[in-house]
């Protein structure tokens, strides 16, 4: 399935049904009074988060959505039926924005969460409503109210517990494939990964979701390369795993480039807990390994983990560290929610 994380769509709620002009028609009742019913309300437009989706690709092929018009009122004071609603089914993590693509309407973060984007028009009054002391047989009824028309943006920010960041070819996709059942495209050239991939990692009876973000380069926050578009997918993560390839001549600079982009992007990414790891260490001799670990430690201010997806060196240790931070974050979140209650 192709990945799409942004879509512009046009929605319109249904018009209300027209009220009816009707009079009682009964045997032995020569002048029956008015009995025109009201029109039904127009259908609403809703957005709802469903399980099993991680792309907005369906909205590439259909951009216009219109709810049904309410049924017209009928005689015998019968109100018309409500028009059918339209429900936009989206992945968990979808945000809805106004036409300017900046004003947030709602943030859909849980399966089953619904939000009404456009309310259907009210039905028109039937002629029964227009009876007065001087007009006992009104021949007038209201048309239904017009529906609401809006242009909106859907923007998906994947919900993952851990995010993988690093320069192109840092080994992010290889790591994801090694510790989860995900099957990202892997090749020996930059920008092999063109969209985020998700995988579920398991360690010591615990499981969490990891997001692999396409490689960043210097200037990504200004739109260079793939730009910073995909950084939005790690905004919701609890921890970042920053991979620095052992193939880099200057591992300190490689680390600093990504840190600079995280800080330039803002939105709290630079403040997230970070685990730094030197990847592809199976390609180094002991002396070179020692030198690169020392340089990276100096740059990041902590002892980097050593990783190799080929020899599986350090994989379990890395997962345990990620799980520990994620557990702490979840516990803190649960404590905050409990305190608010």
Swiss-Prot record:
InterPro entries: G_OBG, GTP-bd, GTP-bd_Obg/CgtA, GTP1-OBG_CS, GTP1_OBG_dom, GTP1_OBG_dom_sf, OBG_GTPase, P-loop_NTPase
Binding site for Mg(2+): 173, 193
Keywords (A to Z) from UniProt: Cytoplasm, GTP-binding, Hydrolase, Magnesium, Metal-binding, Nucleotide-binding
Residue ranges annotated for the OBG-type G domain, each copy included: 160-327
Residues bound to GTP: 166-173, 191-195, 212-215, 279-282, 308-310
GO BP term (any one): ribosome biogenesis
Class of the enzyme per the UniProt entry, highest EC level: hydrolase
UniProt EC number: 3.6.5.-
Main subcellular location of this protein, as a coarse class: cytoplasm
Cofactor(s) this protein cannot do without: Mg(2+)
UniProt domain Obg: residue ranges: 1-159
GO function terms (MF aspect): GTP binding; GTPase activity; magnesium ion binding
Cell compartment(s), UniProt: Cytoplasm
One term under GO cellular component: cytoplasm
Pfam families tied to this protein: GTP1_OBG, MMR_HSR1
Sequence similarity: Belongs to the TRAFAC class OBG-HflX-like GTPase superfamily. OBG GTPase family.
Protein task: An essential GTPase which binds GTP, GDP and possibly (p)ppGpp with moderate affinity, with high nucleotide exchange rates and a fairly low GTP hydrolysis rate. Plays a role in control of the cell cycle, stress response, ribosome biogenesis and in those bacteria that undergo differentiation, in morphogenesis control.
Subunit architecture: Monomer.
Full protein name: GTPase Obg
Native source species: Brucella canis (strain ATCC 23365 / NCTC 10854 / RM-666)
Protein's gene: obg
């Amino acid at each position: 399935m192709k990945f799409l994380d942004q879509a512009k769509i046009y929605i319109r709620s249904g018009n209300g049904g027209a009220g009816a002009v009707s009079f009682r028609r009964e045997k032995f009742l020569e002048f029956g009074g008015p009995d025109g019913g009201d029109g039904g309300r127009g259908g609403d437009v809703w957005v709802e988060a469903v399980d099993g989706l991680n792309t907005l690709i369906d909205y590439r092929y259909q951009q216009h959505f219109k709810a049904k018009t309410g049924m017209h009122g009928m005689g015998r004071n019968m109100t018309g039926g409500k028009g059918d609603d339209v429900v936009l089914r989206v992945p968990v993590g979808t945000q809805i924005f106004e036409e300017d693509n900046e004003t947030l309407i709602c943030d859909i973060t849980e399966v089953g969460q619904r939000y009404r984007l456009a309310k259907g028009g009210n039905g028109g009054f039937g002629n029964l409503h227009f009876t007065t002391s001087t007009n006992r047989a009104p021949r007038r009824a209201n048309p239904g109210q017009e529906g609401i028309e809006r242009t909106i943006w859907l923007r998906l920010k994947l919900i993952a517990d851990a995010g993988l960041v690093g320069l192109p070819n840092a080994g992010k996709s290889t790591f994801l494939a090694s510790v989860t059942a995900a099957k990202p495209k892997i090749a020996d050239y930059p920008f092999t990964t063109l969209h985020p991939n998700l995988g579920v990692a398991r360690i010591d009876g615990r499981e969490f979701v990891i997001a692999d973000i396409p490689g960043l380069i210097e200037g990504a926050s200004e739109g260079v390369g793939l730009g910073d578009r995909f950084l939005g997918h790690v905004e919701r993560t609890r921890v970042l795993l920053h991979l620095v390839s052992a193939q880099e001549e200057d591992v300190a600079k490689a680390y600093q480039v990504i840190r600079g982009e995280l800080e330039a992007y803002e939105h709290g990414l630079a403040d997230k807990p970070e685990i730094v790891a030197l990847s592809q260490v199976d390609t180094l001799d002991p002396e070179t390994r020692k030198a690169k670990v020392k340089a990276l430690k100096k740059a990041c201010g902590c002892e980097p983990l050593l990783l190799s997806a080929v020899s599986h060196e350090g994989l379990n240790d890395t997962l345990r560290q990620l799980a520990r931070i994620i557990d702490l974050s979840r516990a803190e979140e649960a404590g905050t929610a409990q305190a608010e209650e």
